[in-house]
Every structure is written in structure tokens, then in C-alpha cells.
């Protein structure tokens, strides 16, 4: 059995065991680039779920990822590797984007600290300033793109479980916009309390330090236990 996991830093288990977001942040694993640090990956919710399923785990999650990257790399995995037995995806916040420049993809976030080529810096600064104004528009657009992605996976009969890591589709809910019938494939996408971050906080888990949004190994194990019955009913 093969379990495929994609997402952002929460699915990459950033800081869960060691204080790194990317493998390359640790000189011992620099060659792994932006992949999850191996010690963090071993305690990730994905690894916990894979162990319970006795499955082979493939993680494509990357810290600071946009949802565009998540969809693109999942498509690429399906094209290159074929169909896994199950997919879990934790969706990132809606403001993030992926830019393609000179054949390389860049993930941009509203934090204003992303590394982009010098020729993109003016565009990036303007983008950060305007990010808040575009948030609702981005949420609506990504709501649609995730629905299309979900529909494709349904057509391919690939069991998949989605959840939101931090942000829910709050603008859509609050403004009475059309909500899709996701069935059991998406955990309460319109409810903030059911996102990974807020659910763990509500259940007494703290981040690894007060300045971080990331949780430790104990929280990842708990989230895996939360996901397991929801995933197994799809298998």
C-alpha cells in the first residue's frame, strides 16, 4: 500500500522534532533541498498514518508551499508514479501563490521574507502590500481549483482526504456563496475549528514555541489518530 501526502509546513512537520523547516537548513541534509527534514518527517502525521496502515509513505509536502504547488506536484506524481492507494492533503492558506520564472517555480507568501530573484523583487514587494486586499478573491479561486482537483480524483477512483491547515473557506461561508458537497473527502472545509491548527489548539496542544505556528511530535500523532477513521472509511 502506498500513502501519498502533500501540503505545506504542517504536512512537512516543520520543527516537530528538530528546529528546521527545510532539510537544507541542516548542513547534514543540505543536499535534500526544500524537502522535509528526515527527523521531522519521521514524526509527521503522515508517517504516523502510514505506520498504522503499514503503508509505504511518499511525502511531497514543502514548507511555505502554495496550493498551486500542491496541486501541480500531485498531478506530476500521478503522471510519473501512477496511482497511490490513498492521498492526504493539508491545504495551505489562501494568499500564497506560485510564480514560474525562467523555468523555476517560486513560492511566495505574505510574510515578505521569501527569496525571489532580484528581477522579481519589485513585483514581490507590491504583491505583499496588496495581499490582504486579494485574500477573498484568492479564497474563491482556490475553492474552485480544489473542487476541480477533488472531482478529478473522484473520477480516477483515488481515495483522498483533504483538510485545511489554518484557514477555512470563511469568506464563502460568511457571504452566502455556493458551498460544494465534498462528501467525506474534505474535513469541514467551511469551519475554522476543524482546521489542523485550531483543532489542535482547542484540544490542548501548544506550538513548539510561542513564535511558531508549528506543532511537535505529540500533536502530529494526535492528528494522525483523528485522520485515521476518516481515511479508512474511504478505502
Model-predicted segments: where are they?
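Serine-esterase "nucleophile elbow" of acetyl-processing enzymes
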Residues: 1-68, 216
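Short, glycine/acidic-rich beta->alpha junctions
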Residues: 41, 69-70, 141-145
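Acidic-and-aromatic substrate-binding clefts and catalytic sites of carbohydrate-active enzymes
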Residues: 63-74, 170
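Alpha-helical cap/lid subdomain in secreted, periplasmic
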Residues: 75-235
Amino acid at each position: 500500500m502506498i500513502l501519498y501526502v502533500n501540503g505545506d509546513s504542517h504536512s512537512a512537520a516543520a520543527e516537530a522534532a528538530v528546529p528546521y523547516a527545510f532539510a537544507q537548513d541542516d548542513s547534514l541534509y543540505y543536499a535534500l533541498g526544500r524537502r522535509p527534514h528526515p527527523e521531522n518527517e519521521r514524526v509527521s502525521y503522515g508517517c504516523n498514518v502510514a505506520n498504522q496502515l503499514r503503508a509505504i509513505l511518499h511525502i511531497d509536502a514543502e514548507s511555505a508551499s502554495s496550493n498551486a504547488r500542491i496541486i501541480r506536484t500531485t498531478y506530476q506524481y500521478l503522471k510519473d508514479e501512477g496511482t497511490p492507494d490513498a492521498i492526504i492533503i493539508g491545504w495551505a492558506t489562501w494568499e500564497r501563490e506560485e510564480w514560474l520564472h525562467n523555468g523555476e517555480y517560486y513560492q511566495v507568501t505574505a510574510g515578505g521574507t521569501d527569496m525571489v530573484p532580484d528581477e522579481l523583487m519589485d513585483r514581490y514587494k507590491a504583491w505583499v502590500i496588496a495581499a490582504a486586499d486579494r485574500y477573498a478573491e484568492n479564497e474563491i479561486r482556490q475553492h474552485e481549483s480544489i473542487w476541480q482537483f477533488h472531482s478529478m480524483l473522484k473520477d480516477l477512483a483515488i481515495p483522498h482526504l483533504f483538510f485545511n491547515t489554518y484557514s477555512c473557506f470563511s469568506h464563502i461561508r460568511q457571504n452566502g456563496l455556493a458551498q460544494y458537497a465534498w462528501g467525506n473527502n474534505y474535513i469541514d472545509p467551511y469551519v475554522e475549528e476543524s482546521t489542523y491548527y485550531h483543532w489542535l489548539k482547542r484540544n490542548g496542544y501548544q506550538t513548539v514555541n510561542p513564535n511558531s505556528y508549528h506543532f511537535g511530535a505529540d500533536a502530529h500523532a494526535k492528528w494522525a489518530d483523528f485522520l485515521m477513521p476518516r481515511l479508512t472509511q474511504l478505502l
